[in-house]
């Protein structure tokens, strides 16, 4: 007897529990609910037998796989191993070699899994209790060159380390690379404020009115947080040096008031290849 669920079954179960899945017997063409069985067919990608249905209103046919999150995918069997490899520090190129698929397929699967995860995260957060304490900060990385830096605005629930959301924004290079970056790539827009606002406005939907927001002493945070959380309390903590060179999320010694956020950021850097 099979007791282990495949990746698609886990996704389907999650969507059912979250109330996101459509009724399988509803016609996708006319939205009619009067349907009858119309045989079965064997799916080429994994050999599964899928039931077909005929709508009694428009007389058109569809299958129970129409509303599946993996609908029309021909390599659904690589979804789970690809997901496990990508969150284990493996690059897209190496994933393609390990699974013997093209880099284009890996990139498309990454986008698909990202959409599913983001949708599931948002729906699960909306059904949780209102937040009382949130930790918020930015971490930095870059695209293909350090002359093109990126800012990742991250918010987590204090104590539980539950990720509430993040936004990736372009930012101009600073320090010794600022002049070189401008010569090579021109002026780079600073979109950090837009990303922070988008993230904090989403967090506001999940939080109590008197929520506590913890952050470091970045001078750009207070006016932004006051505007979005007028009744909230903003606690600021002085930043400290990292305990390892190049890994600023892991703080040196003693009590860390932003441990939930810093630990989450450190896990990102340890398990996502592009953040190494």
Place the predicted regions along the sequence by residue:
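Residue-level recognition of single "structural anchor" positions
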Residues: 2-276
């Amino acid at each position: 007897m099979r007791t282990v669920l495949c990746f698609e079954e886990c996704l389907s179960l999650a969507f059912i529990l979250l109330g996101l899945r459509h009724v399988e017997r509803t016609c996708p063409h006319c939205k009619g609910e009067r349907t009858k069985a119309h045989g079965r067919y064997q799916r080429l990608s994994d050999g599964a037998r899928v039931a077909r249905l005929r709508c009694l209103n428009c007389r058109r046919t569809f299958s129970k796989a129409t509303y599946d999150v993996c609908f029309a995918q021909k390599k659904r069997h690589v979804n789970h191993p690809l997901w496990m490899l990508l969150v284990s520090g493996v690059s897209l190129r190496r994933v393609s070699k390990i699974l013997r698929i093209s880099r284009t397929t890996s990139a498309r699967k990454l986008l698909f899994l990202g959409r599913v995860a983001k949708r599931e995260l948002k729906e699960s957060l909306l059904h949780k209790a209102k937040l009382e304490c949130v930790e918020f900060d930015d971490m930095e990385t870059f695209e293909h060159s350090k002359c093109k830096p990126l800012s990742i605005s991250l918010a987590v629930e204090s104590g539980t380390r539950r990720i509430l959301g993040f936004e990736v924004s372009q930012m101009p290079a600073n320090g010794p690379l600022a002049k070189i970056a401008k010569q090579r790539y021109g002026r780079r827009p600073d979109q950090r404020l837009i990303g922070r606002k988008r993230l904090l406005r989403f967090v506001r939907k999940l939080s109590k009115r008197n929520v506590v927001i913890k952050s470091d002493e970045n001078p750009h945070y207070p006016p932004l947080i006051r505007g979005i959380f007028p009744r909230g309390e903003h606690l600021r903590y002085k930043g400290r040096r990292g305990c390892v060179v190049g890994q600023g999320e892991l703080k040196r010694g003693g009590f860390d008031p932003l441990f939930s956020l810093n630990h989450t950021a450190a896990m990102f850097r340890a398990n996502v290849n592009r953040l190494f």
